[in-house]
């Protein structure tokens, strides 16, 4: 961090602020403290007739790799709404009966991943801007 996003000062220091125990970027001019917290990724493990829906990534990172539909959680939504949105964006599929399934802390990339177990409403899915292929696998 080179400049304070509150006052524009370049008087930034990476230090432990008062009453804290972790180093953070602090502005020495306006006394703002900047917290770096993990990003939340939300997704779904979708099933239909004992098969799992996977999508082949059409974007970086991991271009060309098969994965579960998932993406970054938005401020204005619930985790469940985020899983529904991401599944539709990446596969074109509608899902139902969402139940919490797994939670992973990926500290090496500062992310928390939350997945739901879900059912496909019907087997309508296909490629999207984010996925070059979408298929059900056994």
Q: Language-model features: where?
A:
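Acidic, metal-coordinating catalytic segment for phosphate/diphosphate chemistry
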Residues: 1-43
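Conserved hydrophobic/aromatic beta-strand scaffold that supports enzyme active sites
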Residues: 3-6, 24, 45, 54, ...
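A short linear hydrophobic-aromatic micro-motif
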Residues: 13-14, 54, 97-102
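Short histidine-centered beta-strand/loop micro-motifs
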Residues: 16, 36-37, 57, 125-128
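A short beta-turn/loop motif at secondary-structure boundaries
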Residues: 19, 60, 104-108
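Short connector loops at helix/strand junctions that flank enzyme active sites
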Residues: 22, 37-41, 47, 61-63, ...
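Conserved Nudix-box catalytic region and its N-terminal flanking loop in Nudix hydrolases
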Residues: 47-89
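Unchanged
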Residues: 73-138
């Amino acid at each position: 961090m080179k400049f304070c996003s509150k006052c524009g000062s370049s008087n930034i220091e990476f230090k432990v602020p008062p009453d804290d125990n972790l180093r953070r970027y602090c502005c020495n001019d306006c006394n703002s403290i900047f917290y770096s917290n993990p990003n939340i990724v939300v997704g779904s493990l979708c099933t239909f007739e004992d098969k799992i829906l996977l999508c082949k990534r059409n974007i970086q990172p991991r271009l060309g790799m098969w994965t579960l539909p998932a993406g970054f959680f938005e401020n204005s939504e619930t985790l469940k709404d985020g899983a529904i949105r991401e599944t539709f964006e990446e596969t074109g599929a509608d899902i139902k009966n969402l139940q919490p399934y797994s939670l992973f802390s990926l500290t090496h990339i500062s992310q928390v991943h939350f997945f739901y177990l879900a059912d496909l409403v019907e087997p309508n899915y296909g490629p999207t801007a984010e996925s070059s292929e979408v298929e059900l696998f056994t």
